[in-house]
Amino acid sequence: MRIVLTGATGYIGSSVLAALVARGHDVIAPVRSAASAATATNAGASAVVGDITDPGWFTPLLHDADAAIHLAASRAGDGAQFDGAVADAVIAAFGGTGKPYIHTGGLWIHGPSDDLTEETPFNPPALVAWREGVESRLEAADLELSIVEPGIVYGHGAGIPASLADAPKDAEGRLTVVGDGRQHWPTVHVDDVADLYALIVERPAPAGRVLALSGQSPTVAEIGEAFADGPVVPEGPDASRTRLGAGYADALMLDQQGS
């Protein structure tokens, strides 16, 4: 298949690219810069430099593809506008064609839950409240749509869990963890997420909404202890909001579990 993959040089996207190339797919990687183009090309993609939020540029690229996977994210904090522009191009190019489109969402849209499923109602924190509007537009369009919601992704020394290692330490040298540390994070390895995207794009029918989870939901304190190889201390909600910004901290402090 000829697959357009946005975000092909990102953390998850680079693993998805590797999985697609290994399966023999022809991957077209729209990227922002010549440096990213070189990275994507070296990984086996056909890279093109351009702006995926420009429908005049992105829509024709999609027209020539058999499928598309959207993993790119805005760097400017304007997710609604960024994903909205991508949605415009996808609907224009793929509407009524039967070509598969895989959109990337996220678990945070569901809010706190001790038993997350694809049917869990939306209750998003402010940081990702915009996602519902974009996804509703896509669901209302005539698309062969799948929406993948990755959990807290880890692996290869990166991802949100790895960022705990950079958190401040207290006077006794103990690592501090965001919030009270008792919140659960539903985790998943980046390579497993990549395999899921590849399997979905090859399906004869869309998958609908799919949670990408490992079935393991450790507490943040447990994750921190694994990194620190010793005890950790809670940073506290207010201190976490001050250090990380209220929106991001509140998302990280969600207590979520799922299998």
What does each model-identified segment do?
Residues 3-25:
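N-terminal Rossmann NAD(P)H-binding glycine-rich loop of SDR-like oxidoreductase domains
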Residues 135-157:
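Conserved beta-loop-beta element that borders a ligand/cofactor-binding pocket
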Residues 77, 107-114, 153-157:
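Conserved catalytic-site region of short-chain dehydrogenase/reductase
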Residues 166-188:
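A conserved pocket-lining segment of Rossmann-fold NAD(P)-dependent short-chain dehydrogenase/reductase
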Residues 2, 15, 194-245:
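Mid/C-terminal beta-alpha module of Rossmann-like enzyme folds, strongest
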Residues 154-165, 200-210:
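Glycine/proline-rich active-site loop of Rossmann-fold NAD(P)-dependent oxidoreductases
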Residues 57, 61-102:
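NAD(P)-cofactor binding segment of oxidoreductase domains
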Residues 28, 87-127:
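Conserved Rossmann-fold NAD(P)-dependent oxidoreductase catalytic core, especially the SDR/UDP-sugar
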